[in-house]
Amino acid sequence: MNLPANTALFTPSWHAELELGYGRFDDSTRPTLRRHKGPLRVQKHLYAEGPEVCQHIIVHPPGGIAGGDRLDISATVGADAWAQLTSPGAAKWYRAASPAFQQLELHVQPGATLEWLPQESIVFSNAQAELSTRIELHGDAKLCYWDVVALGRPASGERFEHGHFQSHLDIRRDGTLLWHERQRIIGGDGLLDSPIGLDGRTVFATLLMTGEVGSELLEACRSLSMPNPVRGDLTQLPGLLVARCLADEALHARAWLIQIWKCLRPALLGREAVTPRIWNT
């Protein structure tokens, strides 16, 4: 029997959900909620820094996000708890005939700290990636959030010529907007090579950390020695520090973010930085 020519159109898409919660119990942070639907999971919680900081590694077993897929992730960190969320490898957004979505919702209660530190997102040419992130901080909650986006696959000779990458990020504290950003990058657009855009770089990264630091620490971060060419800088806004960089490789951008995170974490979050072991694998 001959198969119809459009069989590929019937490839199923994933609608995956992950809901996490964390609470403070005496001197430790423990998971209070772990619910999933579809292929999103978290591995066993870790305590590399001791019982106060609960680390979870979010995994997406299919390994990539295709057209029609939808990932919904939510996490709530209860009062005085500390959660650190990361990933074992890059998220890959594949070429597709229809959009794929990721929705992220994070809530951080008074006295709590959340670190959202995933590895990079690789957006293939012809992908249609659409991300929406909403973060609600309450009282004196603390946050460190970063993202690294790599457009195309230059090592394979693939430029980001078609498709789009779209993201929307809101951060609020007690209902007051701290940070609002919308991005839409079109494959093949002139801004990819323009000096007022990505200036020919294929990777861009952002780190946002709540709090304020003095000029001396800012200069110390700016003067960090990096072995690879990364164009980056930091800006102190009221209640929020912003660090951005452009690079030719995701590895270089991530190395820069890690250095900035190590420099700022003691002052803004109150703990020395301990690099998650998963980043070294």
Swiss-Prot record:
GO molecular function: nickel cation binding
Positions of disulphide bridges: none
Annotated compartments: Cytoplasm
InterPro entries linked to this entry: UreD (IPR002669)
Alphabetically ordered keywords of this record: Chaperone, Cytoplasm, Nickel insertion
Gene Ontology cellular-component annotations: cytoplasm
Major localization class: cytoplasm
Keyword Nucleotide-binding among UniProt keywords: no
Subunit structure: UreD, UreF and UreG form a complex that acts as a GTP-hydrolysis-dependent molecular chaperone, activating the urease apoprotein by helping to assemble the nickel containing metallocenter of UreC. The UreE protein probably delivers the nickel.
Function: Required for maturation of urease via the functional incorporation of the urease nickel metallocenter.
Family membership: Belongs to the UreD family.
Full protein name: Urease accessory protein UreD 2
Organism of origin: Pseudomonas syringae pv. syringae (strain B728a)
